[in-house]
C-alpha cells in the first residue's frame, strides 16, 4: 500500500499539470507537486509541469530549518535521511541549502516508510556528490514543507474536502501507508531496500514492507498500485 502518485487531470493549479485526477494529493509529473492517482498521499516521482510556478527562483529565504542529513552519493545525486521537525514532508523540487543558505540542489525523490523516510537531491551544476561528509546537515525554506498528516489515511467516517471539477481537489484520498520507492536508502548506486515489496522502495533488492520501484527480490509485501 504505497502512496503512489499518478498523473493529474488537466485542471488544478496553473498551466496544465498541477493538481487533480481522482486522488487525494497534489498533481504529479516532472516538475511539480504531489501525486494524484486513486490513492491518497503522493508519489515519489518528479513532479508535473504546472503547480503554481513553483520552479521559479526567488533567491534564498529569510531563514532555513533542518531538512536532512547526508547518507551517501548516488550517481550524480545524493541520498539524505529526513530529519524535519514532526516528520514534515518537503515539496518536490524544493531548493535545498547549506546552513549559510547556499543552494546545493533540489529535492528529487522521496522514499521510505511514513515516519522514517529519505529523499534524494538533484545537485546544482557546480556541486559534486563526493564533496559532502557523512551526516552533514542540509536545510530548507520552512514554507516548502507540508505536515505528514496530509498523507495519512483519513479516520473512518471523516469526510474529505469538496470534490472539484476536472482536476479539482479531494476525491477519493488515502489508501496506503508508505512513500513510493526512489533510489534506495542505504548502499550505493540505485540499490537500497526495495523491489516490489521493498522496505524503502528503491530499484534494488530487499523485501517486505511497502512497494518500491522496479527492484529485485523480496516477497510481495504490501503491494501498492491501485
Curated annotation (Swiss-Prot):
A GO CC term assigned to this protein in UniProt: telomerase holoenzyme complex
Chain positions covered by the region annotation RGG-box 1: 4-51
Family annotation (InterPro entries): Gar1/Naf1_Cbf5-bd_sf, H/ACA_rnp_Gar1/Naf1, Transl_B-barrel_sf
Stretch list, region Disordered: 1-30, 150-226
Family of the protein in this entry: Belongs to the GAR1 family.
Function: Required for ribosome biogenesis. Part of a complex which catalyzes pseudouridylation of rRNA. This involves the isomerization of uridine such that the ribose is subsequently attached to C5, instead of the normal N1. Pseudouridine ('psi') residues may serve to stabilize the conformation of rRNAs.
Name the record gives this protein: H/ACA ribonucleoprotein complex subunit 1
Amino acid at each position: 500500500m504505497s502512496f503512489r502518485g499518478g498523473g493529474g487531470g488537466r485542471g488544478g493549479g496553473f498551466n496544465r499539470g498541477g493538481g487533480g485526477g481522482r486522488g487525494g494529493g497534489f498533481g504529479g509529473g516532472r516538475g511539480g507537486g504531489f501525486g494524484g492517482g486513486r490513492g491518497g498521499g503522493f508519489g515519489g516521482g518528479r513532479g508535473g509541469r504546472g503547480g503554481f510556478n513553483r520552479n521559479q527562483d526567488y533567491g534564498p529565504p529569510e531563514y532555513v530549518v533542518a531538512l536532512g542529513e547526508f547518507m551517501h552519493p548516488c550517481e550524480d545525486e545524493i541520498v539524505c535521511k529526513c530529519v524535519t521537525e514532526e516528520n514534515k514532508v518537503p515539496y518536490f523540487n524544493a531548493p535545498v541549502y547549506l546552513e549559510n543558505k547556499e543552494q546545493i540542489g533540489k529535492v528529487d525523490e522521496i522514499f521510505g516508510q511514513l515516519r522514517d523516510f529519505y529523499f534524494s537531491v538533484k545537485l546544482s551544476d557546480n556541486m559534486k556528490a563526493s564533496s559532502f561528509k557523512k551526516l552533514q546537515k542540509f536545510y530548507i525554506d520552512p514554507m516548502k514543507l507540508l505536515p505528514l498528516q496530509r498523507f495519512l489515511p483519513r479516520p473512518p467516517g471523516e469526510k474529505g474536502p469538496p470534490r472539484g471539477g476536472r482536476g479539482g481537489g479531494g476525491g477519493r484520498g488515502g489508501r496506503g501507508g508508505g512513500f513510493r520507492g526512489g533510489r534506495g536508502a542505504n548502499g550505493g548506486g540505485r540499490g537500497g531496500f526495495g523491489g516490489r515489496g521493498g522496505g524503502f522502495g528503491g530499484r534494488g533488492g530487499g523485501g517486505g514492507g511497502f512497494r518500491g520501484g522496479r527492484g529485485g527480490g523480496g516477497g510481495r509485501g504490501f503491494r501498492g498500485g491501485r
